[in-house]
């Protein structure tokens, strides 16, 4: 076997391989012997068919199969010998084959980039320092009560957190516009669903009143014909409701899995959940900064084959989220996923190099801790932990998560990490 390697462009490579004629003939004869042992031909017992008849009937197809097998095996031998690491599936380009002559073919593919990590010491990471306070727990309890609230009709004026039922008709320069009219429209105040000024114009009014409010559509409004336009809305305020929060009774508290129904038990459960969310949020914030710094400090070439493969993964994930099938997934435009796919490949290559240079292996204690942390959010953590322990694929996925965390920590060990005190709500709002 003769081998030559050339660079085509960037990460592209072409390996040209020549297989000696006698190697081909030896492989063909060997395969014909195997075929002769299995075939049945009228007039001959199984395994007793003369070789010249076997060759006459099956020689062409056997030779084709043998050439395909030799091309594959010789390519693998060549890249091992040349220490080449292909990225993605190779493309085989066969030359002209003539019986009794050497056979030359080429294989085109991309290789993984050579990554030399740099700039780790210049990466800046700000780590949030946060404590879950009693006031934070109080706020979360209020949120839980609001989620379970009922609505009661009232006679008074509309306030910031009320709910209203309205008819409205919008117009610009005296002309009604498409989508600007609704009847019995239910609007929960304070959620920012409407354009600026709309809710403010309703506050202070009472049920039964009809009035007009003046607003201006934002410049970034989605409808081109309304961007930046002054508009009037004729409002018929039909009903005003106020929120009635449930009391923290034992019955209410037990809905959240607190068996003793006590306020203290609910506060403890809420605090535990908030601290788990907080730990995850801090970890994600630090990780995202470390990875962003790593990407900015290391500009690397990316094999197109890996990007294509990642685009296929993202397409299928998108189709699954929206209930589509594989055919519909492949019809989604690649432009929707190209940037995200490239970044995921870059991050994977860089973290892979961090893992390689630091000789990292998944810490089994960390894996165990991650599973326990994840399981604590479920009603029966022990059942979840046992389920994971018996599923090799899930365990391998969790080992990959642990290994990625270890790689990020290796980056952080060299980066400039500063601490900044903040509040639970500030951090969570930034995560949203």
UniProtKB/Swiss-Prot annotation:
Uppermost EC category: isomerase
Q: What happens when the gene is disrupted?
A: Non-essential; synthetic lethality is seen in a triple tig-dnaK-dnaJ disruption, although this depends on temperature (triple disruptions grow slowly at 20 and 34 degrees Celsius but not at all at 43 degrees) and strain background.
Top-level lineage group: Bacteria
- GO CC annotations on file: cytosol; membrane
GO biological process entries = 'de novo' cotranslational protein folding; cell division; chaperone-mediated protein folding; protein transport; protein unfolding; response to heat; stress response to copper ion
Q: Where in the cell is it found?
A: Cytoplasm
Describe the function of this protein: Involved in protein export. Acts as a chaperone by maintaining the newly synthesized secretory and non-secretory proteins in an open conformation. Binds to 3 regions of unfolded substrate PhoA, preferring aromatic and hydrophobic residues, keeping it stretched out and unable to form aggregates. Binds to nascent polypeptide chains via ribosomal protein L23. Functions as a peptidyl-prolyl cis-trans isomerase in vitro, this activity is dispensible in vivo for chaperone activity.
State how it assembles.
Homodimer and monomer. In vivo most of the ribosomes are in complex with monomeric TF; binding as a dimer has also been suggested. Uncomplexed TF is in a monomer-dimer equilibrium with approximately two thirds of TF existing in a dimeric state; binding to substrate PhoA induces monomerization, 3 TF monomers bind somewhat independently to a single substrate molecule. TF and SRP can simultaneously bind to ribosomes; TF binding is abolished when SRP is bound to FtsY in the presence of a non-hydrolyzable GTP analog. Contacts ribosomal proteins L23 and L29.
What name does UniProt use for this protein?
Answer: Trigger factor
Q: Which organism is it from?
A: Escherichia coli (strain K12)
């Amino acid at each position: 076997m003769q081998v030559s390697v050339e660079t085509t462009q960037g990460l592209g490579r072409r390996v040209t391989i020549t297989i000696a004629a006698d190697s081909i003939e030896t492989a063909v004869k060997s395969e014909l012997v195997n075929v002769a042992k299995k075939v049945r031909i009228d007039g001959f017992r199984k395994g007793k068919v003369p070789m010249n008849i076997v060759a006459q009937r099956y020689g062409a197809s056997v030779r084709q199969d043998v050439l395909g097998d030799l091309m594959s095996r010789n390519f693998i031998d060549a890249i091992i010998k040349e220490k080449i690491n292909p990225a993605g599936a190779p493309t085989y380009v066969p030359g002209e084959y003539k019986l009794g002559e050497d056979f030359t073919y080429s294989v085109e593919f991309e290789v993984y980039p050579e990554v030399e990590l740099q700039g780790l010491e210049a990466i800046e990471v700000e780590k949030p320092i946060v404590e879950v306070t009693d006031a934070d727990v109080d706020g979360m309890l209020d949120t839980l009560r609001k989620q379970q609230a009922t609505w009661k009709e009232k006679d008074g004026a509309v306030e910031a957190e009320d709910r209203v039922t309205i008819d409205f008709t919008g117009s610009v320069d005296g002309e009604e516009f498409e989508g600007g009219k609704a009847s019995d429209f239910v609007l929960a105040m304070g959620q920012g669903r409407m354009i600026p000024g709309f809710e403010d114009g309703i506050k202070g009014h009472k049920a039964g009143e009809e009035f007009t409010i003046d607003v201006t559509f934002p410049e970034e409004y989605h409808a081109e014909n309304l961007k930046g336009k002054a508009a009037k809305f004729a409002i018929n305020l039909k009903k005003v409701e106020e929120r009635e929060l449930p009391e923290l009774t034992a019955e209410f508290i037990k809905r959240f899995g607190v068996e003793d129904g006590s306020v203290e038990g609910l506060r403890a459960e809420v605090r535990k959940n908030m601290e788990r969310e907080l730990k995850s949020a801090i970890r994600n914030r630090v990780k995202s900064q470390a990875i962003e710094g790593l990407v900015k400090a290391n500009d690397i070439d990316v094999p197109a084959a890996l990007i294509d493969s990642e685009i296929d993964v993202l397409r299928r994930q998108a189709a699954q989220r929206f209930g589509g099938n594989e055919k519909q997934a492949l019809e989604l435009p690649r432009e929707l996923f190209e940037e995200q796919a490239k970044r995921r490949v870059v991050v994977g290559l860089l973290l892979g190099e961090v893992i390689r240079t630091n000789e990292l292996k998944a810490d089994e204690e960390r894996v165990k801790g991650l599973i326990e942390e994840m399981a604590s959010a479920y009603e029966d953590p022990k059942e979840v932990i046992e389920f994971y322990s018996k599923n090799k694929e899930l365990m391998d996925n969790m080992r990959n998560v642990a290994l990625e965390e270890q790689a990020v920590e290796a980056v952080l060990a060299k980066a400039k990490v500063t601490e900044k005190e903040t509040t639970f709500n500030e951090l969570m709002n930034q995560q949203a």
